[in-house]
Swiss-Prot record:
Location(s), subcellular: Membrane; Nucleus
Stored Pfam families: NAM (PF02365)
Membrane topology per record: Single-pass membrane protein
Primary residence: membrane
Organism, scientific name: Arabidopsis thaliana
PANTHER family the record matches: NAC TRANSCRIPTION FACTOR, PROTEIN CUP-SHAPED COTYLEDON 2-RELATED
Biased composition (Basic and acidic residues): 220-241, 577-596
Protein name, UniProt field: NAC domain-containing protein 14
Location of the DNA-binding region in this protein: 123-180
Role summary: Transcriptional activator activated by proteolytic cleavage through regulated intramembrane proteolysis (RIP).
Residues that span the membrane, as ranges: 609-629
SUPFAM superfamilies linked: NAC domain (SSF101941)
Induction statement: By cold, heat and drought stresses.
Region (Disordered): 198-244, 510-529, 570-600
Length: 652
């Protein structure tokens, strides 16, 4: 093979080369790799060995439009790719930018340049370009894509003797938008056949044609349409699209999508039993008639579904949200309350019966909203979801209790005070003198079905039967028979917000206070190096000690209990030993103080003695010096007198 490459082939015309390519059996293709394009074809072309690479013609691609270039290729094939050598045309004489503009449009580079390696050595770069009609920046994108190969070796820069600067262009035509260049790999890896267009299939994602901006994945239905367009692009193909099959595929896909959504909704309902009992005032939320494939099978927003905590931090999101942004708001509470409280003078038979749901799936909440009524505790029995409730032991929605109160001529002002804030309606129910007394206040902190009684213990049952019946006056005796001896007085209920959980810090002081200051000091003295760790435990509040703090289903109380001092014989002995040690310590301190005072007095005396002795020495020295001075003066005077006498004798 190497010998064949090294041999100089005889010069052939284009017609001869064309005939030789057509003489090859079906299935032979010109499919060089990136490494072969750089190391062999581009290297030979730059070094001036044109005859050896004549299979790739030399064309200035910027002087032709992309749809004219396939006719200039030496290799005639049905494959939508062509190879050309293109001389480097600088946009500016002193710059490195290439001029890629044509008469009708321009080639625009997109994406990052990719490296081409040979044995872990970078030998070249590959740039992806897309052809646009018109002029930038308002060009219209087309389906013509080109890969530009350039060598990075300094020996192939085109400045050496006998060299010319060239780049190798690989032209592609993308028949449809089904093959997204941003998500495709090298198109040369696709198995092409001359008589079919299966390479246009949306499942073929082996092209590396990179578009300017990546788009999202195409839906299966759209991809089927793209397949139809792709198959119908070429008129000389043997494979024809079956329109009926494509249409059936689209219909089947739509039905499959709807079935999947229904199954998803049923699965969520089975996993969340509360979702089976979510009626509104006007009927069920979900039904076959109200189902839309674009909407979620569950009415609640997915952000609240399966949440451990309720999303009620100041934002009362009571609407039923769908994926398309629409929402179905709850029934107006004003109309409901007007019907309950302001129409109690009318006959109960003329009123419109209504029932609010006894349980709702408040986002993040997995318990019954109202599972037990204190005033129905004797007459209403609660059983598992598998059991049936019959007779008088049936579950009655909480809103009917307020209606019964109105039927017994209880003042509505005394019964309920509506507070309209943040889209919710809460009630403060004193009800001191009515038939239910404090039970009504402990029953429901809100008429709104989304607000449940936080003081009720959790129930294991999530299903109760819905009842649409009215309570006759004879049933009131059952409520009157209810004893109120052990009921709590919740008239002082304080609404503290809608946070999902409350944590209380309760610190209990020691039961036996230490009154003796000395003993306390002794204990501190003995145990100053000990660290007493507080015993903390989290206990669930008993229902009898709860006060309404919001809408959370559980309350957690953090109790910190300090260690209680134990008064034992050991403590007494330790206290006595501490007192003795303190006394001895004080004696030592006194003795040290005396020693310090005595030493300080001795130091003062010593200092005074030193000062006195120094003064005496100084005085003695002064006296000696004076005496010496006197003697010297007397001697000098006598000497002078003697000299004077000698001079007198000489003159006389």
């Amino acid at each position: 093979m190497n010998q064949i490459k090294n041999k100089t082939l005889p010069e052939m015309t284009t017609e001869q080369a064309l005939l030789s390519m057509e003489a090859l059996p079906l299935g032979f293709r010109f499919r060089p790799t990136d490494e072969e394009l750089i190391n062999h074809y581009l290297r030979l072309k730059i070094n001036g060995r044109d005859l050896e690479v004549r299979v790739i013609p030399e064309i200035d691609v910027c002087k032709w439009e992309p749809w004219d270039l396939p006719g200039l290729s030496v290799i005639k094939t049905d494959d939508q790719e062509w190879f050309f050598f293109c001389p480097r045309d600088r946009k500016y004489p002193s710059g490195h930018r290439s001029n890629r503009a044509t008469d009708i449009g321009y080639w625009k580079a997109t994406g990052k340049d990719r490296t081409i390696k040979s044995k872990k050595m970078i030998i070249g770069m590959k740039k992806t370009l897309v052809f646009y009609r018109g002029r930038a920046p308002r060009g219209e994108r087309t389906n013509w894509i080109m890969h530009e190969y350039r060598a990075t070796d300094k020996e192939l820069d085109g400045t050496g003797p006998g060299q010319n600067p060239y780049v190798l262009c690989r032209l592609f035509h993308k028949p449809s938008d089904s093959c997204d260049p941003a998500h495709c790999e090298e198109i040369e890896k696709v198995n092409f056949t001359p008589t079919t267009t299966t390479r246009c299939s949306p499942d073929d994602t082996s092209s590396e044609m990179v578009q300017e901006t990546a788009t999202s994945g195409v839906h299966a239905l759209d991809r089927s349409d793209d397949t139809e367009r792709c198959l119908s692009d070429k008129g000389n193909n043997d494979v024809k699209p079956d329109v009926s099959v494509i249409n059936n595929t689209s219909v089947n896909h739509a039905e499959t999508s709807r079935a999947k959504d229904r199954n998803l909704g049923k699965t969520l309902v089975e996993e969340n039993p509360l979702l089976r009992d979510v009626p509104t005032l006007h009927g069920p939320i979900l039904s076959e008639k109200s189902y839309y494939p674009g909407q979620s099978s569950i009415g609640f927003a997915t952000s609240h579904m399966d949440s451990m905590y309720s999303s009620d931090f100041g934002n009362c999101d009571y609407g039923l949200h769908f994926q398309d942004g629409a929402s179905e708001q709850d029934a107006s509470l004003t109309d409901v309350l007007d019907e309950v409280f302001h129409n109690h003078n009318e006959s109960s038979n003329d009123r419109k019966d209504f029932v609010l749901p006894n349980m709702m799936h408040w986002p993040g909440n997995t318990r019954l909203l109202s599972t037990e009524y204190p005033f129905l505790k004797d007459s209403v029995a609660f059983v598992d979801g598998s059991a049936e409730v019959s007779g008088s032991q049936q579950f009655v929605p909480d809103i009917l209790a307020s209606r019964w109160v109105s039927e017994q001529n209880v003042d509505s002002k005394e019964a309920v005070e509506i507070l309209s804030s943040t889209g919710s309606s809460r009630t403060l129910t004193p009800l001191h003198n009515n038939v239910f007394g404090q039970y009504a206040s402990s029953s429901y902190a809100a008429i709104d079905p989304f607000n449940y009684n936080v003081n009720q213990p959790e129930q294991s049952s999530f299903e109760q039967s819905h009842v649409d019946r009215n309570i006759s006056p004879s049933n009131i005796f059952e409520f009157k028979a209810r004893s109120r001896e052990n009921q709590r007085d919740l008239d002082s209920v304080v609404d503290q917000g809608t946070a999902p959980r409350r944590i209380r810090l309760q610190i209990e002081q020691p039961l036996t206070p230490v009154t003796n200051k000395k003993e306390r000091d002794a204990d501190n003295y003995e145990e100053e190096d000990e660290v007493q760790s507080a015993m903390s435990k989290v206990v669930e509040e008993e229902p009898a000690n709860l006060s309404a703090q919001g809408t959370a289903q559980r309350r957690i109380r953090l109790q910190t209990r300090l260690r209680k001092p134990l008064i034992t014989l050991n403590n007494t002995k330790r206290n006595s030993n501490g007192r003795e040690g303190e006394a001895s310590h004080r004696k030592c301190e006194m003795q040290e103080k005396e020693d310090i005072s005595s030493s300080s007095s001795w130091q003062k005396q010593k200092k005074s003695l030193v000062q006195f002795s120094s003064v005496v020495i100084i005085v003695a020295v002064i006296v000696v010096l004076v005496e010496i001075w006197k003697e010297s003066r007397d001697a000098k005077c006598s000497f002078l007198f003697h000299q004077l006498d000698s001079f007198k004798g000489m003159f006389t």
